[in-house]
Amino acid sequence: MTRDLPGRSPAAAPVAMSAVLMLALATPGWAANGINAPGYGAAQLGLAGAGTAMAENTFASLRNPAAGVWLESGASFDLGIALPVGETSVGAVGPNSRFGLIDVEPGRYTSVSGVFPLPSYARNWRHSDRTAFGWGITASGLKSMTKGGSAALARGLPGFDARCEGSFGGGAPLSGTSDLLGLCGNGDAPLGVDLTQVLLSGHYAYRITDSLSVGVAAVLAAQRALLRGLGAFAAFSNEPARTTDNGFDFSHGGGLRLGVLWEIADGVGVGAAWQSRLRQTEFDRYRGSIVGGSLDIASTLNVGLQVHPAEGHRVLFDLERIAFGDVKPFGSQVDPQRFSDECFIPRLLIRSDNPSELPACLGGDAGPGFGWGDVMVYKLGYQARFGTVTWRAGFSWGGNPVNDGQTLTRFLAPAISDRHATLGLSWRRSSGAVVDVALVHALEQRTRERNVFSNAQLSLLDGALLGYRVDSDPQDQAFESSMRVWELHVSYSWAP
């Protein structure tokens, strides 16, 4: 399980510089399972994120803190670039549709594009044959931005309806149209979410026997979030002024990571690592959009197996469970009928700058969230070493958390892919330093669902109030979302 990294005395300056660079460049990851990175460093990524049972370099301690004692003193720095392209095609509302809560202008929208840096760093000190300690920092997240288009709100109701700039109506009324009730957001028209999570961890590993080690890590987490283009939904939030377009907001918190690494037989090893839910402070600027105000980082459980079928060859298989469903803003699903009956219609009929709180509105206890569920990710990797060069390949699947029926969530953040194919190689230099390279491709994934809010039937609620019946039917407009990503990572491991 060990890669020997020649040891020298620790050097504090490179560590500090790497940490500063990491914090300066931290941006969301793209080839991800939900918002979780599939692996840390080019060696793990070349295996599609498998490696809970392997201590290949210091990045192993970011997944499994028990790995540190199997490594010599050393450091690793990784820098990747991502080229994501996310698109959503929106169809027209059916010809027989007379009313709708919100429908998006038909067309093709590019929601994610660009080149993004993805840095990480890890450090390990081997104190003795039985103990090791170190630290590391990494980032992940979610980013989406959709420009152009318009949205119709309360379509078909004379005096109520409005058509606004922006795919969710966050901008001003379209030229030549009226907005008597002020439903348009009159703010940023582009629709987007930008969430970055940075984890700083310090680990301690202890070898119980020659073949068994355990580890623990304290984890500090910082988050940065921005929401744009949701101004039309401010009227349907419990805190309208804290719904959208308020710049970046920050939160922080922490938790614990535990790990075990066991060589159960010659050529066979197993590993397991658990990270607790990382509790976070509230995003005060976006309490009107985020259920409960805070966005905790979901707990994860990783279990891995590695087998050495022949000298220099390894086969790895990992399982990863991510409990997104336990985090209320992620796990809360959009209930279209309840949102219509208990939020949209009451707020539409009774306009107020200081509305009373309604549980079904944005930010409420029963308000809409991302509609994500728990995921189980399967990772398979193969590694072959020939002299100073090591080749890797991997494939992972099963990491899409978005539940069926969460159409608007997919439009807001379609950057979800659950299949990753990877290739990697390493070159050990004469100095003992190692260069790792990984190419990650998130295979294009397409989802097709209907916008149940785009077609509605007028009805009467209890008390003879106006109401809508919203459910999926052929008159609803269709949303087809797709995402594809290429990432290139280069890691450098050395003995400071």
Roles of regions detected by a PLM:
Residues 55-63, 69-161, 197-198:
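Outer-membrane beta-barrel translocator/receptor signature
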